[in-house]
């Protein structure tokens, strides 16, 4: 039954009992129905998992599903055959805005802000998959709007709700590893093609796909099977590469532990692809096969902190304290935090936090829990959002925190794009280009408050993007 009809029928049935949308009463009030009315955007793939997580709370009613690709959306449509379906998010806004309490956005990275912001401006709560946005400007804007409108927000980096993330913070604050000076993070991604040429062939658009809507704010181009499904992550116009995919999961621990602000410096190096003898490929529209990124933070308590990121098969050196046969991280990646008294390591999603050398775990007595645990831990991340919307509970990854984390991830990508950029001098060809004399291959100095690179102006073009006409941010 559609919610509008339900409200009408309920009002007619009883004047003593009514169902009131939670946004009418405010986020600190529980509606009599204790139900959150959600519109979901991007319901295939990861979106299907989030939808099932929302449904499992028993406190969510889906007002509508919106997806541009019926093939990817089919499993969700089959599970919820009675939920109204859309392809264009703007029609959801026009037709169902008043019936919605919250939105869930799990579309490709380049459309997160485009879809979420209009609803956020109307005080709709927002659950948005990681990374929060496609570029730094969007992340800052999402953070500001969330604060201005006083809405409940959550980014989909579920490790933020884990017990281990809180345990790690309590350990560090107890002083057991001293002042942190270096952090190493790594992932096994990409597990999709990167370092590839821009597709030029025009393939047939699948009848179930609205290609124009899928492109959204990105420039129009011919459809090619190289983009879908999932492989869009490896193209800068749509995705954010290995770092964008996993950085918000793996960097979650140091961000939670240290409450990091904006980085002040960023520097990158990437795998080189060669297309001829001594001729480096210009695949700058594609994220590189692998990269190493160095970020610097200034921290009031710990001093200067270096955060190093590795992807595409690259990994940091093993800690000296590691015994022969001991491993670090898991198959997806991990984090090492070096202090002047010891070392803390954890797996992907902040799991399995532990101290090195390993005998420290036997000798150390953990402090009493200081930070509230989320019921269900990492598995309770989605329910934590619902609880925030209905009961005013604090969410683990609100946009104030998630925005800064996303900006840091995207700052690393900005350094990668600067490294990839080939600035040819007039009259020169790719064979004349000297990679060791490239102005983008430098340490970039970042003014976080003003969102500006101060020593390489070209890189400021990647702080935002060119939006296709008609798709500008609302």
Spans of features found by a protein language model:
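N-terminal secretory signal peptides and thylakoid transit peptides that target proteins
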Residues: 1-14
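N-terminal Rossmann-like dinucleotide-binding module
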Residues: 13-80, 159-162, 172, 254
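Short acidic-hydrophobic, aromatic-tinged amphipathic segments that line or gate anion-handling sites
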Residues: 84-88
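Short amphipathic alpha-helix with an adjacent loop that forms part of the alpha/beta core around
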Residues: 91-98
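N-terminal Rossmann-like NAD(P) cofactor-binding module of classical short-chain dehydrogenase/reductase
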Residues: 103-104
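Beta-strand-loop-alpha-helix segment that lines the small-molecule cofactor/substrate pocket
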Residues: 108, 113-161, 175, 441
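Rossmann-like NAD(P)H-binding beta-loop-alpha module
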Residues: 164-210, 214
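Glycine-rich, aromatic-lined ligand/substrate-binding cores of catalytic
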Residues: 202, 207-394, 398, 404-424, ...
